[in-house]
Regions:
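Macromolecular interaction modules
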Residues: 1-105
Length: 105
């Protein structure tokens, strides 16, 4: 299993609350429609505790393989999800993560 993480900085004209609302409704529905997606998690930075963090949040998308990830992004659902990014994101840095569990709970 592989995990793609996207580190996100919201558009400057959106409040944090508006960013969270859009991210968890419209954009999440687009992402969830991608074929082969095994797990999808969105995370938001607590701005009260970390007001100077460079990111507003990050996403985690799990796939069985790199080929499944690439197929999902190339699909019509993946293309719709990517096309939606400028509606709420200024900067998106995406990477594939190798996860090593130290403590399983």
């Amino acid at each position: 299993m592989i995990k793609r993480c996207g580190f996100i900085t919201r558009r400057g004209d959106l409040s944090h609350d508006a960013f969270v609302a859009y991210r968890t409704s419209r954009h999440a529905a687009l992402g969830a429609a991608m074929p082969g997606l095994r797990r999808y998690v969105v995370n938001f930075i607590d701005r009260r505790r970390f007001p100077d963090c460079a990111y507003d949040g990050f996403s985690e998308l799990w796939f069985d393989s790199e080929a499944d990830l690439q197929a999902a992004l190339a699909s019509s659902a993946g293309q719709a999800m990517l096309a939606d990014v400028p509606n709420f994101i200024d900067v998106l840095t995406a990477t594939v993560i190798e996860e090593r569990v130290i403590v399983a709970g």
